[in-house]
Amino acid sequence: MSVRPQNDFDGKAFAAQLSTAPGVYRMYAGDDTLLYVGKAGALRKRVGSYFNGTPKNARLTSMLSQVARMDVTVTRSEAEALLLENQLIKSLSPRYNVSLRDDKSYPYVLLTREQWPRIALHRGPRAVQGRYFGPYTGVTGVRETLSLMHKLFKLRSCEDSVFRNRSRPCLQYQIGRCSGPCVDLVAAPDYAESVRRATMFLEGKSDQLGEEIMHSMQQASEALEFERAARLRDLLSSLRSMQNRQYVDGRAADLDVLACATQSSQACVLLLSFRDGRNLGTRSFFPKTNGEDSADEILGAFVSQYYAEHSPPREILLDREIPEAELIEAALSTAAEHKVALKWNVRGERAGYLLLATRNAQLTLVTELTSQSAQHARSEALRELLGLAEPVKRVECFDISHTMGEATVASCVVFDASGPVRGQYRRFNISGITPGDDYAAMRQAIERRFRRAVEENGVIPDVLLIDGGAGQLAQAQAALADLGVENVLLVGVAKGEERRAGHEALIMADGRELRPGAASPALQFIQQVRDEAHRFAITGHRGRRQKARMTSKLEDIPGIGPRRRASLLKHFGGLVGLKAAGEAEIARVEGVNAALAARIYANLHGLALPDAAGEASPQ
């Protein structure tokens, strides 16, 4: 239900006509900006509490002074209200709620759900059907897990496009890291059994898995199936070896440890994870707060929101008691379909884990605040150097990368006073220009970036850095003028003498040059932004160039048309398989004779190409 008042919002009257059922309430400002999302065991009582008496702190006073209307959603239980509250906070990011930064970049192990499941590293939205295990503290942890999984269970890692088109096993099969389901070298029931065991391992049930494998090995031995018994023995040996390397403490088999540190209106929540006795490392989160949230409120919000997106372990240690712990515990247990216990008064080893997490949270927050302080100082120095009246809130920098005109890519990176805003980085694949024309590439990138901003009333930077001299700066100026973009300070960043860092010249739109010197905090900030733009452009360029070269390898060979190219790639399961084949193997592909096979082999290995005379027409 919703009420939009004609005049000032009457919170008491609104609360009086609400149900006493549990639910979620939302507060909106006059311009429909969402201010706050909350949950209630009894809507009438909870909403009414905001408007009875004086707000208990400045944050509430500020928030309530802006409320123009409220919405409520009735739920069946308070636990259901808690889940809905977390979903809304995650998707809508209300101004006054404690909210987590997006964690889509954290890596997971993905086990796909299909006839022949694939196991692989995964980042980003969960668009692929399957089970996601994690998140891990970094890519290294995922790769170590995947390497172990391939050795133990021999599950495929190839993409479906490669899997469907192979005609012979790949290198992974040859080195004993895949069972070869692509060419029917493993029976479906056996592969399914490997998937089941891999799932048990990822669920932290390696002890149970070891007992099961030992039992199967004994059965195989009794049945005189000695080859199968030997395979199971090797599997068990590898599993035991892994457990001995990674075992930490059997009593911390499946456990998360959370600690919250606060300082200067900022907070850090540190997560230390153990799975099957293995220390998976730590991750730090910096929730958005309003300066007056207490550490227990911040930690409580973190627990609710984080485990709404990630599978909780059976035991979660907290460095302090959190509000509504019993309710959160019940909601997590219901969602996870197993008992989840929240604990804060612990002894022995677990107290040691909490102490470790607490110290790390405090150190991480101090490091973050120090970094932010230095970043703010550099941003302020930039404002003074450029003569701006207002603080610099947003800086963008463009750079161009290519190899002799090939695969040209432009990058746009974004910084604010706190540092890089990586979620707003953009790359532009440049096309339709003379190869190697950096001026045209810069103009195209600027036009594409700011045309969208003009059409959609998007955000415009305070300062726009152009990596290059007067020529690139002039192109950016012309592009912005054509689009009618104003109030952007353009600065060209030209290489210094002998291209030495610290000797850069800053070229202003009016032709002035500034040379702040290597000791200038403002120049250090510009160098940081410029170097990040350079890195981001090069990474994009290399990826585009590699993709183009892989695609064009066969296209450049006389006698290879679309049909033959498709036949070759299908026969060998891709360019990698084709490159590993000899001339005789290539010549067995339908439509490829010995002469053409020799040309293909020579092209792929950088050898002198045989004469193409007498070849059939491309197909």
From Swiss-Prot:
- Got a GO cellular component term for this one? excinuclease repair complex
Tell me the keywords, alphabetical order. Cytoplasm, DNA damage, DNA excision, DNA repair, Excision nuclease, SOS response
Q: Which SMART domains match?
A: GIYc, HhH1
Q: Example GO molecular function term?
A: DNA binding
SUPFAM superfamilies hit by this protein: C-terminal UvrC-binding domain of UvrB, GIY-YIG endonuclease, RuvA domain 2-like
Q: Which Pfam families match?
A: GIY-YIG, HHH_5, UVR, UvrC_RNaseH, UvrC_RNaseH_dom
Subcellular location per UniProt equals: Cytoplasm
**Annotated ranges, domain GIY-YIG:** 20-98
**Residues in UVR domain copies:** 207-242
Record keywords: DNA damage included?
yes
Q: Which family does it belong to?
A: Belongs to the UvrC family.
Question: What is the annotated quaternary arrangement, including any partners?
Answer: Interacts with UvrB in an incision complex.
Instruction: Relate the protein's function as given in its record.
Output: The UvrABC repair system catalyzes the recognition and processing of DNA lesions. UvrC both incises the 5' and 3' sides of the lesion. The N-terminal half is responsible for the 3' incision and the C-terminal half is responsible for the 5' incision.
Q: What is this protein called?
A: UvrABC system protein C
Organism, scientific name? Xanthomonas axonopodis pv. citri (strain 306)
